[in-house]
């Protein structure tokens, strides 16, 4: 028995798509939500939002992360360097995910060397810790983008509907009388 096909009255989910026309509203929403300016472009803004969220994640979870590095390439690092490696790996990965989901070309913004810290997280526990930080950080941003883009599209659709629902009647004329004229 399979429950993967659409039912008779099922609706397909609306998957938002970032387009250039969304740039200003998306940048403004990110600035309002995360207090990070978009003056240097959306890619830079996303990277700085990612850095802010990853810093918050590290601040809340650093003790747990430092406690699971045994057996990984991070073993032997002091707390400061574990934190630097974690933040670098999480920021670049989160930014990559955000740019990729928005249809931007992450390869235009990153080089191979930017991802080298990711390879230090080579045990199941360290991979899980890094993955959780990336997932939680990118989810916060992507949910904000989803809300912003959906609202923008609804407003655009409402404006379009409103302009098409207007009558093209001249106010002084009105509708013509459909009754036959008396003889």
Q: Positions of the model-derived regions?
A:
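N-terminal accessory/interface modules of nucleic-acid-binding and processing proteins
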Residues: 1-175
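Short acidic DE-rich linear segments
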Residues: 182-183
């Amino acid at each position: 028995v399979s429950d993967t096909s659409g039912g008779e009255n099922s609706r397909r989910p609306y998957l938002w798509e970032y387009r250039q026309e969304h740039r200003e509203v998306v940048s403004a929403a990110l600035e309002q939500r995360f207090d990070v300016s978009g003056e240097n472009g959306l890619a830079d803004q996303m990277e700085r939002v990612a850095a802010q969220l990853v810093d918050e994640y590290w601040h809340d979870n650093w003790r747990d992360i430092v406690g699971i590095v045994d057996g990984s390439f991070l073993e032997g690092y002091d707390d400061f360097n574990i934190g630097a490696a974690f933040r670098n790996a999480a920021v670049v990965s989160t930014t990559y995910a955000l740019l990729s989901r928005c249809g931007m070309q992450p390869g235009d913004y990153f080089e191979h060397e930017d991802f080298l810290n990711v390879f230090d997280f080579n045990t199941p526990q360290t991979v899980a810790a890094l993955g959780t930080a990336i997932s939680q950080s990118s989810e916060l941003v992507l949910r904000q983008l989803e809300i912003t883009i959906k609202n923008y599209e609804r407003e655009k659709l409402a404006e379009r509907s409103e302009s098409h629902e207007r009558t093209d009647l001249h106010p002084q004329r009105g509708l013509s009388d459909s009754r036959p004229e008396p003889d």
